[in-house]
């Protein structure tokens, strides 16, 4: 009997997302319920955004939750390497096989040519897609351009008509017209694969039998299915999980909810409660109980109990469930966990240099730096009153800084400062006009340790959470203001 093998393949391009943890949990439970294996693979082909720091955060977040893997970059295994950036020769080999078999082709089109192609198609009311012009080149011309070292990509051929049937374990057969599919790039001009080629090659070579992934990938499933057909490989069983959503039913995003697992760890949530809550996202126990452990979820896991309705990720409900777990702990364990959370040595070492020179006794540390150990702060609206800025300008400054910080890929003091500086310059203000607002929102005080250092230490999700909290306190942002300020944001370098 074939061993069930599932996997999670996150990209190390930022803080570990609760959506990644959600998909990892369901893959883990499915594998373990069938006595199988769970694999961790790192999709780091985006060389500009991928970092080893983010990769380590993924490891730490999953382990904090209690999700362990049988094979992966840090534990090894018989199917490595488990980082896509280390598998370049493998992808090149299989891409060349597709070209030689007539299933893929070299494309030398420049970015300017592709942009013009899209513009002309849109002007005609057509859906933008590659028009196949590279297929008109002779074999001799292709070889000449390859020999000359011209930049190129490799694209897959796709049918221009007909229907692709996607067998989904949750929805049954899903029919998707081929004319919606583009001639997907498989190998980029930097020699690295795109998601589609790497995904299929890796899943096959690593013996993945079942793929549980987010439903946002369902519309592009025909490309993956066609690649399996081209290679002559058996495709894994496919299961497209419903997406996590905000309480307003929009797709879960950091603009409306903290999305980093690290944020919830920092806020003092229990990993058992977090897993329990993620397990209830579109799934339920046979007896409908609300509180259950990872082991209990594995024991009773059944895909047929997954609901296709968009599961709502609600922090208030998560907090309620966390309280259930917290209050049922033995007092000794509660005290031990509290100590481990509050006096985490790594976190303390980040904070200590910023408070040590400002206190005379240890008892003064809490009033000065207590905000480092809090989640939501009790903010005072009076702290946001400004002699130079109107109430509307105060909200505008905070909102624009929040938006700029949301686009920040590397969370470093210098880059945080750059975001704030860019906003104040665009508004023709001084840095000293904005910093009191940052102190008020981030520390809950008029002055404290360097607020820029504090923002770096607190991390992106908690920083953004507090800025949103400040905006809510000050009355929020109207739809009209949101529209106007987003236009202004687009002009800020």
From Swiss-Prot:
GO BP: any one term: glutamyl-tRNA aminoacylation
Subunit structure comment from the entry: Monomer.
Superkingdom, natural source: Bacteria
Protein name, as recorded: Glutamate--tRNA ligase
Highest classification ranks of the organism: Bacteria, Pseudomonadati, Pseudomonadota, Gammaproteobacteria, Pseudomonadales
Gene, per the UniProt record: gltX
Location of the motif 'KMSKS' region: 251-255
Binding site for ATP: 254
Database matches in Pfam families: Anticodon_2, tRNA-synt_1c
Renumbered ranges of motif 'HIGH' region: 10-20
Reaction(s) catalysed (UniProt annotation): tRNA(Glu) + L-glutamate + ATP = L-glutamyl-tRNA(Glu) + AMP + diphosphate
UniProt family annotation: Belongs to the class-I aminoacyl-tRNA synthetase family. Glutamate--tRNA ligase type 1 subfamily.
PROSITE patterns referenced in this protein's UniProt entry, alphabetically: AA_TRNA_LIGASE_I
GO CC, alphabetical: cytosol
One GO MF term attached to the UniProt entry: glutamate-tRNA ligase activity
NCBIfam families according to UniProt: gltX_bact
Organism field: Pseudomonas putida (strain ATCC 47054 / DSM 6125 / CFBP 8728 / NCIMB 11950 / KT2440)
SUPFAM superfamilies in alphabetical order: An anticodon-binding domain of class I aminoacyl-tRNA synthetases, Nucleotidylyl transferase
EC numbers, comma separated: 6.1.1.17
Function: Catalyzes the attachment of glutamate to tRNA(Glu) in a two-step reaction: glutamate is first activated by ATP to form Glu-AMP and then transferred to the acceptor end of tRNA(Glu).
Cellular localization per UniProt: Cytoplasm
Alphabetized UniProt keyword annotations: Aminoacyl-tRNA synthetase, ATP-binding, Cytoplasm, Ligase, Nucleotide-binding, Protein biosynthesis
